């Protein structure tokens, strides 16, 4: 089972901001840009597909959401140097921040993906507590936003991404996740 925290295809999204799309050499933004970036990461992502699906099933999180985060955080590993990114602060495919967590496992291994996904779940649960009237899907999107900028940054549904990297984190990740959902994740 992978739908404990909502169904990714039911989440509304505006996709990538132009600020996120531009460094990817795209002259357009939005959902189309997110999908194009996700497509560019698909070949690398597929190396980890079995592992992503295993962790998703184990923790009841949609594997497509995990893939969406991995694409955004590390381009499925392509943006990392010896498993590290973000000036040596982020570890692994899901970029676990060593300033807030003690990274475990290999940068591309099951323990790392489990840790990253557990951090995501903890954020979703914080958002569930903070916004009990939101739908499951809204809480999932809020949790994704909080994965980047913390639950304190999520104040309203419409503006949850203001304060995330490029002000589009959850919207971009959700659009990428919807792409991966169509590709067997």
Curated annotation (Swiss-Prot):
It comes from the Eukaryota. It is found in: Secreted. Disulfide bonds join 4-60, 18-29. The active site is at residues 73, 86. Keywords: Antimicrobial, Bacteriolytic enzyme, Disulfide bond, Glycosidase, Hydrolase, Pyrrolidone carboxylic acid, Secreted. GO terms for biological process: defense response to Gram-positive bacterium; killing of cells of another organism; peptidoglycan catabolic process. It catalyses: Hydrolysis of (1->4)-beta-linkages between N-acetylmuramic acid and N-acetyl-D-glucosamine residues in a peptidoglycan and between N-acetyl-D-glucosamine residues in chitodextrins. It is an enzyme of class 3 (hydrolase). The modification Pyrrolidone carboxylic acid is found at residue 1. GO terms for molecular function: lysozyme activity. Its EC number is 3.2.1.17. One of its GO terms (cellular component) is extracellular region. Belongs to the glycosyl hydrolase 23 family. Shows preference for N-acetylmuramic acid residues that are substituted with a peptide moiety. It acts only as a glycanohydrolase. This is Lysozyme g. It comes from Casuarius casuarius.
């Amino acid at each position: 089972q992978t739908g404990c925290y909502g169904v990714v295809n039911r989440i509304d999204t505006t996709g990538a901001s132009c600020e996120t799309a531009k460094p990817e050499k795209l002259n357009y933004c939005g959902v189309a840009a997110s999908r194009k970036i996700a497509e560019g990461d698909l070949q690398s992502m597929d190396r980890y597909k079995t592992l992503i699906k295993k962790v998703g099933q184990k923790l009841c999180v949609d594997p497509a959401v995990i893939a969406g985060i991995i694409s955004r955080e590390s381009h499925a590993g392509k943006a990392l140097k010896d498993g590290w990114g973000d000036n040596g602060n982020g570890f692994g495919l899901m970029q676990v921040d060593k300033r807030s967590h003690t990274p475990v496992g290999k940068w591309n291994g099951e323990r790392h993906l489990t840790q990253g996904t557990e951090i995501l779940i903890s954020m979703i649960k914080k958002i569930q507590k903070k916004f009990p009237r939101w739908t499951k899907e809204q809480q999932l999107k809020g949790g994704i936003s909080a994965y980047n900028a913390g639950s304190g940054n999520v104040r309203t549904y419409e503006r949850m991404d203001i304060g995330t990297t490029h002000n589009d984190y959850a919207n971009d990740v959700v659009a990428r996740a919807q792409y991966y959902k169509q590709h067997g994740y």
